[in-house]
Amino acid sequence: MLSFCRAPLPPRTHRADESLIIYEDGASSLEFRKSSPEDYLLRNMHPPWDTKKPSIMVPPFHFHIYQTEHFRIVSGSCHLFKDTATKPWKTLSADDPNGVKTASIPPNTYHTINNASTTEPLVIDVSLTPEDVEGEERFFRNFFGYLDDCRKAGQAPSLFQLMVFLNDSDTPLGLPIFPKWLGVAASRAFLQGMGLFGRYVLGYQPSYAEYYREKKMI
């Protein structure tokens, strides 16, 4: 293992026991709730959109290999991008009575979201099916906990660490390669290569005790 070659990890903030986690000095948050067929697992708050300083909550262009991702607007408005990161596919709006309130993205479809407003926060519910409650909570807690700790430490996140998190959740970055089938295949290969190298050569972990408390199996 060549862990001595990797970028230093930031000091980790202990958040494993919090169901509502505050990030970016109060500007954003994640709230985990008990799973049920009628509800969404995750409630996510984004600050107003700032092109010069995007929130850590804005996900990179990505896709899910096996899961469909579902979105439900709670307050504010949200741009949802599908297949292209330059033009919104849909805008979800809580204030427009005739506006779209929910949307779903099937597996192997590039997508991302951002706050459609530059003045108001966005609150949106997120779930994935088929559901993996522990796996999803572990990923979100580690991914955003790490990004926020990097922000506080004033250091750039390690791409290898991010890919270790993403590989553990079967979520490739959407590489801009055409045709689509080739982009999906290349993105999956890039995810596995970077994720495995980051974990088994550089020693990055898919989960840290400060961010996520592993559930005990009975």
Predicted features by range, described:
Residues 1-68, 72, 79-218:
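Jelly-roll (double-stranded beta-helix
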